[in-house]
């Protein structure tokens, strides 16, 4: 049974405010649990997973600046994570063809194999954490959040 808003006669702005707070709380709880599981089960971090995920989608690599833009973090954060991935043999950096000043980061075959293990665990954890949503609920929430994102992007 889905709980209803506390007061259905209140202004929609109040309901939207509570919705925003609920989204933040749920997102924070999920993120904290993912961080904990990555640390405990793989001795790694969520930001490291995020960098590996971005690099896994670009087999030819990504410029460091594009990687930081994609992940919406500073160049310094990305550089530190890529440095550690490189030290561990999971990534490498090469000069960008045509611009030796720019570097492209990409996963090594070992890094790709590690990422696939992390990604499988990540998907399983999220499936477990969101098991309270049936298929229809998950699709509806996904579509509504997509609609909201599109409306914000259009502003």
Where on the chain are the PLM-derived regions?
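N-terminal leader segment of winged-helix/HTH proteins
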Residues: 1-42
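A structural signal for well-ordered alpha-helices, especially hydrophobic packing surfaces
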Residues: 27, 59, 115, 149-152
């Amino acid at each position: 049974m889905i709980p209803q808003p506390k007061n259905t006669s209140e202004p929609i702005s109040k309901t939207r405010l509570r919705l925003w707070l609920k989204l933040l709380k749920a997102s924070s709880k999920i993120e904290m649990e993912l961080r904990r599981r990555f640390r405990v089960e793989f001795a790694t971090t969520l930001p490291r997973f995020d960098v590996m995920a971005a690099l896994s989608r670009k087999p030819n690599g990504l410029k460091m600046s594009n990687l930081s833009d994609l992940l919406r973090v500073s160049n310094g954060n990305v550089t530190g994570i890529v440095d550690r991935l490189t030290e561990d043999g999971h990534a490498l950096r090469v000069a960008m063809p045509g611009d030796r000043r720019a570097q492209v980061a990409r996963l090594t075959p070992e890094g790709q194999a590690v990422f696939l293990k992390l990604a499988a665990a990540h998907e399983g954890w999220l499936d477990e954490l969101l098991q309270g949503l049936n298929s229809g609920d998950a699709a509806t929430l996904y579509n509504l959040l997509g609609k909201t994102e599109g409306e914000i992007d259009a502003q």
